[in-house]
Amino acid sequence: MTIVHVITIDGPTASGKGTVAHKVADAVGYHLLDSGALYRLVALASDRIGVDIEDVDGLAKTASRLDVKFGPDRVWLSGEEVSLAIRAEAIGNRASAIAVHQPVRDALTKLQRDFRKLPGLVADGRDMGTVIFPDAQLKVFLTASVEARARRRYKQLIDKGISANIEDLLRDLEARDARDRNRAAAPLRPAEDAKLLDTSDMTVDQAVAQVLEWFAAVRKA
């Protein structure tokens, strides 16, 4: 049986996991799964049709019917490019609230696992190594101080032309961290066999180099 290698990169909001995952995928020539984008797509789609964030059945149905397409740095929902729309802070907060519901997570599980194709996959999210790909060849858990993450998120938003307030971002991150850690469905935590990487004082390239070093060691084993 052909083994399709998977690298999982999990961590809290704005820990740098998305950027690191993208660069690692480019370096090794693997497919990329941005699982957070899927939850943001559910948030956007459900918001547009008026589904309340506590309507679990409605949210799960929305998740199961997602018509999505991913391209380099772009994403489409039902044929409409929504790359910028899903990155709005309001959609991010809604996605975090929606992600606590197990039926929504269940609806997205198969969709996420379908990304596992040759030559391999780099998957970033919050439960990639613990729930979606527990047999991944390399599991990485990225973290950083909440202050460092707030600064990064602020820069990301400003660079994209989205207005932001760093104090508001700090409060939002703290609230999301608490919600992610304490939810009953797939709480945010490192897999037991994950490599821990604190990126508070690291550049993106340094973090990428460390992940690639770990993966090279895994492939030699």
Swiss-Prot record:
| Keyword line | ATP-binding, Cytoplasm, Kinase, Nucleotide-binding, Transferase
Q: This chain belongs to which protein, by name?
A: Cytidylate kinase
Q: Name one GO cellular component term.
A: cytosol
Query: What organism is this sequence from?
Result: Cupriavidus pinatubonensis (strain JMP 134 / LMG 1197)
Q: Where in the cell is it found?
A: Cytoplasm
Superkingdom as given in the UniProt entry: Bacteria
In the UniProt record, the gene name given for this protein reads: cmk
Lipid metabolism in keyword set: no
Q: Which residues bind ATP?
A: 11-19
Matching InterPro entries: Cytidylate_kin, Cytidylate_kinase_dom, P-loop_NTPase
Recorded catalytic reaction(s): these are:
CMP + ATP = CDP + ADP; dCMP + ATP = dCDP + ADP
BP terms from Gene Ontology: nucleobase-containing small molecule interconversion; pyrimidine nucleotide metabolic process
Q: Where are the transmembrane segments?
A: none
**Protein family:** Belongs to the cytidylate kinase family. Type 1 subfamily.
Question: Which GO terms label this protein's molecular function in UniProt?
Answer: ATP binding; CMP kinase activity; dCMP kinase activity
Q: Does the keyword Aminoacyl-tRNA synthetase apply?
A: no
Q: What is this enzyme's EC? A: 2.7.4.25
